[in-house]
A protein has these predicted regions:
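An anionic, turn-rich surface loop/hairpin at beta-sheet edges
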Residues: 102-119, 220-239
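N-terminal glycine/threonine-rich, aromatic-flanked beta-hairpin/loop signature
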Residues: 55-102, 176-228
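Hydrophilic extracytoplasmic domains
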Residues: 28-29, 218, 228-273
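Bacterial N-terminal signal peptides that target proteins for export
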Residues: 1-9
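Tryptophan-anchored aromatic micro-motifs
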Residues: 36-54, 152-177, 212-213
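Residue-level recognition of beta-strand termini and adjacent short loop/turns
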Residues: 66, 121-123, 188, 241-243
Length: 273
């Protein structure tokens, strides 16, 4: 798990810069496809690292829009043991040479990150790659990892469909409840409101928070909020679907022993008076 934390942290470093370069590396040469840049167009999410599933908290979304431009969305907080990052479609420059991609980031005058992807297979729904990452600080290697990674393509984008007021109808997995006492109202500006029932059974906005923000990229939902005099908190979910007035989220979570479990949360849209 720590290995992926390092990968996610390094990926976040990319988002602090817009330097994307390509190199030729003859390690494990393959010919996964012609016109790689064209096949990459769209949104992609990492789902397996070295054959192990990636938990939702550590996922991100890469969006390739051309042969020279890409975006990345990722949320990492201090509780994950890494640098705090909140990037909603951070623009990146992209260069591709054959089946090789190398991401190079000079995040500051001391730190350089080089991330290499040697793509071994790609089709319309997934791609796999041999992956190397090296982070140096003042010329000294601080991190080096190698492994295999699999991305799957996201076919839907729920940024517009999530706008509105939603009431939670139940949570399963890890903990289960159905008290009908949670509402979230998502706005187009990337903020949201949280509602609870008061003692009289009336819906009341929670006003003890300094801020509440979210973003959706494809089906990846990230939220963050901060209560007065408390640390910032975050959540990560994957939107399964939004169909008319029904919405479902899922998330793969990790236990302290490294095992995983899935959570499912169902929502119903509320039409405001």
């Amino acid at each position: 798990m720590k290995k992926f934390l390092s990968w996610a942290f390094a990926a976040a470093l990319i988002c602090s810069s817009t330097v994307f370069t390509s190199c030729v590396n003859e390690d494990n040469p393959v010919n996964p496809a012609d016109n790689l840049a064209e096949k990459l167009i769209g949104k992609w999410m990492p789902v397996y690292l070295d054959g192990n599933p990636v938990v939702t908290d550590l996922k991100s979304v890469y969006t390739f829009v051309s042969a020279t431009k890409a975006y990345m969305s990722v949320s990492i907080n201090a509780q994950q043991g890494e640098e705090i990052v909140w990037n909603n479609q951070k623009e990146l420059d992209l260069s591709i040479n054959g089946n090789k991609m190398t991401l190079t980031n000079h995040s500051d005058e001391h730190t350089t990150m080089v991330e290499e992807f040697n793509i071994t297979a790609i089709d319309g729904s997934a791609f796999t790659a041999n992956h190397k990452i090296t982070v140096t600080v003042d010329g000294s290697v601080m991190l080096h990892n190698e492994g295999t990674i699999r991305f799957e393509k996201l076919t839907r984008d729920y940024r517009e469909a999530i706008i509105g007021l939603w009431e939670c109808k139940g949570l399963k997995g890890g903990e289960t409840y159905n008290d009908g006492n949670d509402r979230l109202e998502f706005f187009e500006d990337g903020t949201y409101k949280y509602w609870r029932k008061n003692d009289a059974g009336e819906w009341e906005e929670v006003t003890t928070r300094e801020f509440q923000e979210y973003f959706v990229d494809g089906g990846f939902l990230c939220t963050r909020w901060k209560n007065v005099d408390e640390d910032e908190l975050r959540e990560w979910w994957e939107i399964v679907n939004i169909k008319r007035d029904k919405m479902q989220w899922k998330a793969l979570r990790a236990n302290e022993d490294g095992s995983t479990f899935e959570q499912i949360m169902d929502w119903e849209k509320i039409e405001e008076d």
